[in-house]
Every structure is written in C-alpha cells, then in structure tokens.
Curated annotation (Swiss-Prot):
Belongs to the cytochrome P450 family. It is a peripheral membrane protein. It comes from Drosophila melanogaster. One of its GO terms (molecular function) is heme binding. This is Probable cytochrome P450 6a14. Its main location: endoplasmic reticulum. Disulfide bonds: none annotated. GO terms for cellular component: endoplasmic reticulum membrane. May be involved in the metabolism of insect hormones and in the breakdown of synthetic insecticides.
Length: 509
C-alpha cells in the first residue's frame, strides 16, 4: 500500500515538474507572453467561446511592437506567434531550411489519407512536392480549365433554376451550398475524372461525402484541436482523425478509377492521370536501376491521399471564397456593376463570347476583387511552421528550440489597420498595382509563401474566377431580408465558414 502511494506520488511529481518546465518556457526565454493556464495553455474557450483567430488577435494586439514574436501555448505546444513581417519573411523564405515542416497531423500507417502533401515532413514532403509540381503548371491548369468552364455553364443553369424556385421566397437563394456543388463537380472531374452531377442532384454521393468531411468528426472538437496542435504526440498514440467509412470511400474510388483506366487504356487530362503517369515513371526508372526509392514513389495509398487533399482543399476553399465574394458584391452594388462591365467588355471581344483560360488574364478588376475577398476573408486563420533545428532569431538573443511552432497570424495581419486602413471595409483598390508595390510582401498571405506555399493556388483562383464570371454575367446579387449582416462565423471549424447558409436576392441581368 505504501509502495503504491509512493509510486503515485512520484508520478504526480514528475507530471508537475514536466508541466512547470513546459509552461515556463517563454518566461525562461525572456519572451513577452500571456500567462498560461494548466493543460489548455492559452487555448481557454477554444471552439466554444473563441475561434483560433480570436485568440491570435488577443495576443497579436497585446504584444505587437514588443519584439518579433510573442509566446503562447497551444495546449502543451510551445508556439511563437510572429508579429513582425520581416521575421515572417525569414521563416517562410530566407531561412526556410529551419522551418520546412508544418507540424501538421499525419499518420499514414493508421490513417492513410492523412499522408498527403500538406502534412508530410522532411524528405517525404520534398520528394512528393517535386513529383506533384508538374501537375499544377500553367499548361496543366489551362487544360483543366476547359472542364471548369463546362461546369460553370451548368452552374449558371442551376442558379437559373434556383431563381425560378426562389420567386416564392422573394428571390432568396442560398448560394453557399450552390457554390459548393459547383466546386464538388469541378474537383470530381479534374481530380477523379468522375461526373459527380451534384449541381443537378444536391444529394449526389460525392457532395454528401464532401459535406461529411467537415461535418462528421471522429472526435470532439476539443480533442480535434488537441490533435492538430500536438500532432506528433497524436501520431505516437496512433490516433486516427477520419471516419473509417470516408477513408474507405476515397480509397476505393481511387483504386477503382486507376484499375479501370489501366485495364481499358483510358487516358484523361486530370489529376489521377498525372499520378498514374508519375507512378509508371518511377517503376520504369527502378527497372533501369536508376536508384529510385519507391518508398517515396506513388503507392496507391499515396495517390489516394493526394487526390483526397486536392478534393478537400479544392472544393471547400474555392466555394467559400466564391460565396463570400458574392456576399461582399451584394453589399457593394457599385463594385459589382463595375466588375460585370469588365466581364462583358472582355467577353465582347472574344469569338462567340465564350469564356476561356486566356481571357481571364484580361479581367484585372476581377483579380482585385478576388484578392480583396481573400484579404478580408482568409480561409485559414493562421499558418504554422515547425522548427526542424535550433534557430536564433536575427538581431536577437532568442533561440527557438527544435520542435517549437512558429505561427503566422494571417487573419490578424490582413485585419491590421496599420497595414490595411479600415480593414472591415471591402475595397478592391487595395490591390491596385501601386498599392501592392508599396506594401510589405508578407502583408498578404492567403496561400502562404515560399517553397511551402499552396501548390494548388493557381487552380483554386482559376476555379473561383470561372465560377464567379459564370454567375455575374447572368445574374445580379443583392441583400435580402434573410441576409445576415454581418455574417456570423463558426467557432468550431478551423476553416473560415459561416454558421448558416448565405442567402442573397438573385435576379437575372
């Protein structure tokens, strides 16, 4: 009995000592920081009372100007919130070799779809990035844009149908789901080579599965937050994050698609085809004894993981950007009309008035409107980089130890009045060429920057632009009695999303 009591005392003592060591880190470093609470650190109220961007804002506002970083604790994870734009450039570009990992959760052994490019680390990430970069060249995006334009036509038809049905509700149309169905059909075709038909059928299987990725959780939101802020510990515990049936759905979809194409000699200009070709190149090189390490090659599981993240990142981010853009344009009819006039003017000089990849480059105001949407509504509240070795902050005595997270508070930078006066105002002129030239390059980071920026940023922007043009050339958007002004955003979702649908009054032009 006494031995048991003594053992419990020793364990509790060790736990207390470890707790003190972790939560005194920034104090010992002499870095300004908020006093942490036991276990949760500075995450008190997360997902219930606060979103990540709210906690980041509190710390950013309190400590900006006191040094390049402010210390915080994301549960047990020691995190440096960066408040200095020059130091952000050091982390993301100049000293990238110290910060090449994201510290994101990945557990391919137990949860194969988490072995995707966004989360991979070190040489695994470098090898996969090298393989996938050719998939997202301008030439490849141009080929895929033809599919996106076709889906855009169906989007216009689906909106036309929604407008007819909405007459009984004073023209109210819920645009958030419609935009998500558009991007689901685009990604389904461009990534998997499948006709999802969710624009015609809102209950289509791919649309349902896409929705479930964000609405179904294997764990509570609090546990999810812990997993994603303590990724390595979660991996050691062999935790999974995706429901098994969703994993099985995407794994079988990729396997069946690959098997069918190889068996029947079918080729398409899509993401799956590019990965099939990359896999074949690896196998051919290995046969010739060129030293290709197939453990870094594209196994079926790796192919499924890359297709999965392409689907998740491609449909949710672009659809949210589109719906938020239309919302802002509904509030600013003059901006909406100027954009529509640009669209009509450019397309008037195209044979048949047909939209294509090349004419999008002529729509400069569209680019400004989209950029301002992503400035005001960045879909990720922050970017994370993890120190892969000890790093001394330039012109400072502060050394960030290996494993410390560096947090770039994107949302808070985008809403800093010293960088963007009247940050809550939607103003595309912020992205006039001269304005952009005079602004710090790290003041705008919707897609990150440096070697680990978003590999699919060009695809995402083209998809959103084609969707917006397809709608704005045919329809006018305005606020209605069901439009939330301001919008109410979810505190539970890591990505920026509204609690409810976005309702606008929609009329034919």
């Amino acid at each position: 009995m006494l031995f048991t009591i003594a053992l419990v005392g020793v364990v509790l003592g060790l736990a207390y000592s470890l707790h003190i060591k972790i939560f005194s880190y920034w104090k010992r470093k002499g870095v300004p920081h908020e006093t942490p609470l036991p276990i949760v650190g500075n995450m008190r109220g997360i997902v219930k009372k606060y979103h990540f961007r709210d906690i980041n804002q509190r710390i950013y506002k309190k400590f900006k100007g006191q040094g390049p970083i402010a210390g915080m604790y994301m549960f047990f994870k020691r995190t440096a919130l960066i408040t200095d734009l020059d130091f952000i450039k050091q982390v993301m570009i100049k000293d990238f070799s110290y910060f090449q990992d994201r510290g994101a959760f990945t557990n391919p052994r137990d949860d194969p779809l988490t072995g995707h490019l966004f989360a991979l680390e070190g040489e695994e990430w470098r090898a996969m990035r090298h393989k996938l970069t050719p998939v997202f060249t301008s030439g490849k995006i141009k080929q895929m844009s033809k599919v996106i334009v076709d889906v855009g036509l169906r989007l216009g038809d689906a909106m036309d149908k929604a407008v007819k049905e909405a007459k009984v509700e004073e023209g109210n149309v819920e645009i958030k789901d419609l935009c998500a169905r558009f991007t689901t059909d685009v990604i389904g075709s461009c990534a998997f080579g499948l006709e999802c038909n969710s624009l015609q059928d809102p209950s289509a299987e791919f649309r349902q599965k896409g929705r479930e990725i964000f609405t179904r959780r294997r764990h509570s939101t609090l546990v999810q937050s812990f997993i994603f802020t303590n990724a390595r510990l979660a991996r050691k515990l062999r935790i999974k994050v995706l429901p098994d049936d969703l994993t099985q759905f995407f794994m079988s979809t990729v396997k069946n698609t690959v098997d069918y194409r190889l068996k029947n000699g079918i080729k398409r200009n899509d993401f799956i085809e590019q990965m099939i070709e990359l896999r074949a190149e690896d196998q051919e090189a290995a046969k010739k004894g060129q030293g290709i390490d197939l453990s870094h090659g594209l196994t079926l599981e790796q192919m499924a993981a890359q297709a999965f993240v392409f689907f998740v990142a491609g449909f949710e981010t672009s659809s949210s950007t589109m719906s938020l853009c239309l919302y802002e344009l509904a509030l600013q009819p003059d901006i909406q009309q100027r954009l529509r006039e640009e669209i009509e003017s450019v397309l008037a000089n195209v044979d048949g008035g047909e939209l294509n990849y090349d004419v999008l480059a002529q729509m400069t105001y569209l680019d400004q409107v989209l950029s301002e949407t992503l400035r005001k509504h960045p879909l990720l509240p922050h970017l994370i980089r993890e120190t892969t070795k000890d790093y001394q902050i330039p012109n400072s005595d502060i050394v960030l130890d290996k494993g410390i997270l560096a947090l770039i508070p994107v949302h808070n930078i985008h809403h800093d009045p010293e960088i963007y006066p009247e940050p809550e105002k939607f103003d595309p002129s912020r992205f006039d060429p001269e304005e952009v030239k005079n602004r710090h390059p790290m003041a705008y980071l919707p897609f990150g920057d440096g070697p680990r920026n978003c590999i699919g940023l060009r695809f995402g922007k083209i998809q959103a632009k084609i969707g917006l043009v397809s709608l704005l050339r045919r329809f006018k958007f305005s606020v209605s009695n069901r439009t939330d002004v301001p919008l109410i955003f979810s505190k539970k979702s890591f990505l920026l999303t509204t609690n409810d649908g976005i309702y606008l009054k929609v009329e034919r032009v």
